[in-house]
Amino acid sequence: MTVLGVTSITNILLASVVFFLAGRMSRSPKARFSAAWYFNGVLLLLGVAALIGAVDHGFFESAGLPRYAIRCADWIVLGGVTFCLLMTTAKQFFAPRVQRIFLIVAVVQFAVDTIAVLLVDSFLDVILNYAPVMLLFLAMNIVGLRTGIGSMQMITGILILSAASAIQAAGWDRLSPLDHNGVYHVVSILGVVFL
C-alpha cells in the first residue's frame, strides 16, 4: 500500500471517530447557539474535513488529478471548524456583550480565510487561521480551571492536537508507511477523544 493510501485510511479513521463523538454529543439536547451547540459544530465539521481529506489523498493526489477544488473545499470546511471553535470559546468564557463582538470577528475571520484559501494555495493559511483560536481556547480553559468553567480534559486534548500539528508541520516521516500526515491523523484521534 502506498503512503497516500495509508494517509487516506488514517483520515477515514479520524473522520469515523470524530463523527462518532459528534453523534454521541448530539444525543443530548443543547440550547441553540450555546457553547455545546457550537462545539458540536466543531466535531461535525472536523469529521467532514477529515473525510474530504481522505478523498483528496486517496483519490485525487494519488491519481495525479488537479487538487485545487477539493483542497479548497477541505480548507474552507476547516475554516468553519475554526469559526465554531471561536464561538465555543466566546460562549463558554465571555459575557453576552463580548460574545456579539466575537461573532463579528468570527464571521470576518471566516470570510477573510475563505478568500485567502481561494487565492493562496498553502496549508499555512489553515494553520495561521486556527492556531490563534486554539491558543485562545487553551488559555481560557487554563484560566477557567479556577472557576470551574475550564476543563483539564479539553486542555489535554488541545495539547495533544498541538503536538499532532507540530509533527505534521515538521514533516516527520519516520514511521513508514505512515508519513507526517498519517501520524498527524493518528495522534489527532487521541486528541479528539479527550475533547
Predicted regions and their residues:
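Polytopic alpha-helical membrane-helix bundles and their juxtamembrane interface segments
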Residues: 1-44, 54-74, 82-195
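Extended substrate/RNA-proximal surfaces in nucleic-acid metabolism proteins
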Residues: 78
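Conserved phosphate-interacting/catalytic interface
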Residues: 51
